[in-house]
Amino acid sequence: MTSTPIERAVYIVSDSTGITAETFSHSVLSQFDEVNFKPVRLPFIDTLDKAREVVARINRNALEAGVPPIVFSTLVNPEILALVRQSNGVFLDLFGTFVSHIEQALGLKSSHSIGRSHMAANSEKYRNRIDAINFSLAHDDGQFVNQLDQADVILLGVSRCGKTPTSLYLAMQYAVKAANFPLTPDDFERGALPKTIAPYRGKLFGLSIQPERLAEVRNERRPNSHYARLEQCRYEVAEAERMMRREGISWLSTTTKSIEEIATTVLQEVGLERV
C-alpha cells in the first residue's frame, strides 16, 4: 500500500524576480521525494506593506496546516528582510547566509542592491543572450541552415529527444548559440550524416533517449501513429546511436537527466565556457 505523500507549503520571497531563490529551492527540495511541496512564488516584495501581506499569508498557512511552511528568501532590504524573518515559517536567507561570509573574507561591505544579478538590460551579456536565443530559434530542428558556422554547438538526435529545450536553455542561461538538427530515417538509409552539417563535425554533440520514453513522448504529439510506435522508436534510436559512434560524435542519453544536467554536460564535452 502506497502512503500518501507529505505536503508542505514553500514560499519563495524576493524583492526582485525571485529567479535565484526559485532555482535554489528546486535544487534543494528535489532531494526529498517523499514530500509533495507546494511552491508559492512571491516576487517584487519591495515595500513594507507588501512584506506585511507576505507575513500574514505565511502565518495563516502555518496555522491552517499545523506545520510551518518553508520560506526561501533573497530579500535584500534590511527592514523588509527583518519583517519577513519574523513570520512563522522555516526562514532560509539565501543571500545573508553567504554575503556575510564574503564580506568578512574581503573586508568589504556588499552594495545591498536589489536585483543586481538581473539588471542587465544594457549590458553586453544581456545582448549576447538575446542574440543566442534568436539564433537558436532560427536554427531549430534544421529549419535554417545558413550561418551554422556561427553556432557554438549543433545538437543532433532523433525527433523528440530533447534537442529544442536544450538548445534554448543553453541560449537563455549561457548565451550559447545552439543549433539543433534532426536525424531521420532517410539519413539512416544513406548511412551518413546530413550533408548540411557534415562540415561542422567539431561542433556536433548528440542526444539520445530510451525508445520506451521516446514512444511515450511521441504518442503525446501524434497518438497511434507509425512515428510513435515502439518498434519505430527502437529502430531510430539504435540507428542514431550507431551513426554517432561511427562518426566519433560524443553523445548522451537524456532519459533520466534534467535539462540542467544535459546542458552542463554539453558545455563540458564541447568545451564551452559559462557566461
Swiss-Prot record:
UniProt KW Transferase keyword: yes
Positions with a binding annotation for ADP: G157, V158, S159, R160, C161, G162, K163, T164
Single GO term (MF): protein serine/threonine kinase activity
InterPro entries in the cross-refs: Kinase-pyrophosphorylase, PSRP
Domain of life: Bacteria
Pfam families linked to this entry: Kinase-PPPase
Top-level enzyme category: transferase
Catalytic activity as recorded in UniProt: [pyruvate, water dikinase] + ADP = [pyruvate, water dikinase]-phosphate + AMP + H(+); [pyruvate, water dikinase]-phosphate + phosphate + H(+) = [pyruvate, water dikinase] + diphosphate
Record flagged with keyword Ribonucleoprotein: no
EC number of this enzyme: 2.7.11.33, 2.7.4.28
Keywords, alphabetical: Kinase, Nucleotide-binding, Serine/threonine-protein kinase, Transferase
Similarity remark: Belongs to the pyruvate, phosphate/water dikinase regulatory protein family. PSRP subfamily.
HAMAP family: PSRP
Function: Bifunctional serine/threonine kinase and phosphorylase involved in the regulation of the phosphoenolpyruvate synthase (PEPS) by catalyzing its phosphorylation/dephosphorylation.
Descriptive protein name: Putative phosphoenolpyruvate synthase regulatory protein
Source species of the chain: Bordetella pertussis (strain Tohama I / ATCC BAA-589 / NCTC 13251)
